[in-house]
UniProtKB/Swiss-Prot annotation:
This is ATP synthase subunit delta. GO terms for cellular component: plasma membrane; proton-transporting ATP synthase complex. PROSITE patterns: ATPASE_DELTA (PS00389). GO terms for molecular function: proton-transporting ATP synthase activity, rotational mechanism. It comes from Flavobacterium psychrophilum (strain ATCC 49511 / DSM 21280 / CIP 103535 / JIP02/86). The gene is atpH. Keywords: ATP synthesis, Cell inner membrane, Cell membrane, CF(1), Hydrogen ion transport, Ion transport, Membrane, Transport. Signal peptide: none annotated.
Length: 177
């Protein structure tokens, strides 16, 4: 819990600095790269989380892995080095991207489908999104075969369930009453 709060504080500070230096977009790209790299590379995540590895080694490794990042991003690495908080780097990157999207009026729509989305389903989802939100929306697709067909759409605290599994549950309740 406290590491999440710390990640939010770091993310707010970084977005403030990046905005003041007109580098918020570039830093957002860096943070997306950092978050996806840490999430997809278990060795890097283990390395960052390992308390027995010296913070100097962590900073040097991150500066080497993310050599092409913005100076604001590199200054975050140094700040985490000074405060010995490298273990929250992934959380900071995720929180930064959430704040960046919020500031720029972008919402993430989480769409769960039984199979990967095709153009037809994506058009239906975008039409439904238009009824939920007037903001610019990016779609994040998750595949879950247990919903059988259709889709489940989540935007913020709203959910629209157009899955076959949900329709079957509704039908089952109606028949049992």
């Amino acid at each position: 819990m406290s590491s999440t709060r710390a990640a939010i504080r770091y993310a707010k500070a970084i977005i403030e600095i990046a905005t003041s230096k007109n580098a918020a977009n570039e830093v957002s790209n860096d943070m997306f790269l950092i978050a996806t790299t840490i999430n997809s590379n278990s060795e890097l995540d283990t390395f960052i989380q390992n308390p027995t590895i010296k913070v100097e080694a962590k900073e040097n490794a991150l500066l080497e892995v993310f050599a092409n990042t913005n100076e604001v991003t590199k200054s975050l690495f140094h700040l985490l080095f000074e405060n010995k908080r490298f273990e929250i780097l992934g959380a900071i990157a995720s929180e930064y991207n959430k704040l960046f999207d919020e500031i720029n009026g972008i919402q993430v729509a989480k769409v769960t489908t039984a199979i990967a989305m095709d153009a037809n389903l994506e058009a239906k989802v975008k039409a439904k999104i238009a009824t939920f939100s007037d903001k610019k929306v990016t779609i994040e697709n998750t595949v879950d075969a247990s919903i059988i067909g259709g889709f489940i759409l989540r935007i913020g605290d709203k959910q629209y369930n157009a899955s076959v599994a949900n329709r079957l549950q509704v039908l089952k309740r109606e028949l049992s009453n």
